[in-house]
Amino acid sequence: AILRIRTRTKPITVAQRHKRRRTILDKLTRHPKMQLARMDDVAGCRLIFNSVAELYEFRGSFQKARFNHRRRHDLDKYDYIKQPKETGYRGIHDVYEYDVRSAAGRALAGLYVEIQYRTLVQHAWATAVEVIGFITESQPKFQRGDNRYEDAMALASEILARSEEGLNGPFP
């Protein structure tokens, strides 16, 4: 509810996101000590902004908002805009522990919810990576398969970061 209220009058796209079953099982296989109940990115939402400046401005004001949900990590831990992944992924992930006082919501207390922040350019790039996974035998998102896709997408991320956002991507 707090996100709906804060984004209502702003040019921000808000979308629910649920991790696909296959992706959950894959993550549990890759990280055998992980428990499904403690997986922090199964449910959440994605906020898509027109610019990096708007993204950081909104996130900064949201961090100062008064609510009971608790961010589970340091502010910059999952800031992949400042520190892009080698794959070229850029965006920010904040994980909150859901805290609700109402009787109706009590069953959800303690649930981890992820908020992803991306620009439209970053979202388009991430969507292209997903599409490659759907139409080829490769999974560049997980660094599996033909590494030419990974290399091409990392370069594409760098080009987009520099040309569209005035930032660096995964390359120095």
Regions found by a protein language model. Give the residues of each.
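Short, flexible, solvent-exposed loop/turn segments with mixed acidic/basic and small polar residues
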Residues: 29-40
